Amino acid sequence: MDSDSWSDRLASASRRYQLDFLSRSDNFLGFEEIEGEDDFREEYACPFCSDYFDIVSLCCHIDEDHPMDAKNGVCPICAVKVSSDMIAHITLQHANMFKVTRKRKSRRGGAQSMLSILKREFPDGNFQSLFEGTSRAVSSSSASIAADPLLSSFISPMADDFFISESSLCADTSSAKKTLNQSLPERNVEKQSLSAEDHREKLKQSEFVQGILSSMILEDGL
């Protein structure tokens, strides 16, 4: 599969995860209301229909009702003309707005949401191989993460839940594959090894997924 296509699909999955996560944050276990929240909640006019929403609802509204218009408009927060992606601009340039009325106590639930979204984005057989590469990439960076206790406390629970969930979801598939492989003759070692090009593509895909996970973890930890 073309690497650009993988990148587009993963970027789309990441954005859907972030919007889904933010829009349902009130229902996540471990969230606590900050005293006087209603006093700080501001509403902004949608740049495409002039209806008013709080910052999270605005992003969800634009994504659902104005997906085509979102590539060109004026940011309702800073009044800057955006010519690429309005939602990406708001979530990246005004990330602090999402944290004004909330403080985070737990990361529980985030990994499961990301997992389900990626499963929908990759319904074919490529999902499992993608995470095999991601697991190796995360392992290779575990030493540097362990050096920072704060980062480790955020990343470790999410990573454990993420890959344990993936293992349980793929248990039946793995069992079936094992039975099938036992009935087949031994394959040539050369056929089992990936070509250099396949290896590079899988490595690129793994690094991209790791980058998405890391960026979301670091943004939530700020």
From Swiss-Prot:
Q: Which UniProt keywords apply?
A: Nucleus, Phosphoprotein
Q: How is it modified after translation?
A: Phosphorylated in vitro by CPK3 or CPK11.
Principal subcellular localisation of the protein: nucleus
Subcellular localization, as worded in the UniProt entry: Nucleus
Q: Which residues carry this modification: Phosphoserine?
A: 116
Do you know what upregulates this one? Not induced by abscisic acid.
The record's section on Pfam families has: Di19_C, zf-Di19
Disulfide pattern: none
Query: What tissues express this gene product?
Result: Expressed in seedlings, roots, leaves, stems, flowers and siliques.
| Gene Ontology CC terms, in alphabetical order | nucleus
Q: Which family does it belong to?
A: Belongs to the Di19 family.
> What protein does this entry describe?
Protein DEHYDRATION-INDUCED 19 homolog 6
- Write down the species: Arabidopsis thaliana
Origin organism lineage: Eukaryota, Viridiplantae, Streptophyta, Embryophyta, Tracheophyta
